[in-house]
Every structure is written in structure tokens, then in C-alpha cells.
């Protein structure tokens, strides 16, 4: 069992007369080697926000450390995420995210994570995605299945 504070904000006591706004973790992906973690936390209110966070495992602290935060990685939420299986010749990790904005995105780590490709098909909704077992092929579904 492991505990990690993803949203880093839900501990504040409620202000008098104000409605508390708590973020919820809606999606989590862990790389097969356990070195990388991606989370999506959302706040659905008049202050709506979606944040994709990339975490790296630290052997020194024996803890995940936040590396990158991306606000609104997909403008209408994230359906799913998965890391590419890392092969023997691969040194750069990739994450595939599928959003409710009709797009799938590839994220790559350099010093920080950034979107390196945005994929869409005929204005159809992206409904799912995944990697082949060796990480060489991406499968995406668009539209009605």
C-alpha cells in the first residue's frame, strides 16, 4: 500500500459561507517498470480545471516526485492513458492519452514532459487507445464501435 497526495489541495477547511471545491483523481497510469506515474485530477465546478501530472520514482526518497504539470491536456477531460511498454533499445518514455476533445496525444519525456503529437480522425471522437506488447504500434479507436 502506498499513499501519494496527488491534488495537494484538499486539506483546506471550509470557509464560512463558501462551498468547498475538491479535486478528484480521475485517471492513473503507471509504467511497467514502475518508474513513471501519470495522474489526471479534475475540479468540476465554476472553477473547472483539468491537470495532467507526470511523476518520477526517486530511489533516494523512495517516493514519487512531481516532474511536470499540464493544465487542460485535453479540453473536455481525459478518457484514458497508458505508457508505452519500454523496449530494450528505448530510452525515452512515451504516454498515450485519449481525451473527450476528439483527440489522442503522445507525451514524451525530455527534461520535462511535453506533447509531441496530436492525433485525430475525421472529427470523430477518440474512444480508446493502447500499445502493442512490444510498444512498436499504437491502436486507436474513433467514433462509434
Residues of each region from the PLM?
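WD40-repeat beta-propeller superdomains and closely related acidic/aromatic-rich repeat-like regions
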Residues: 1-145
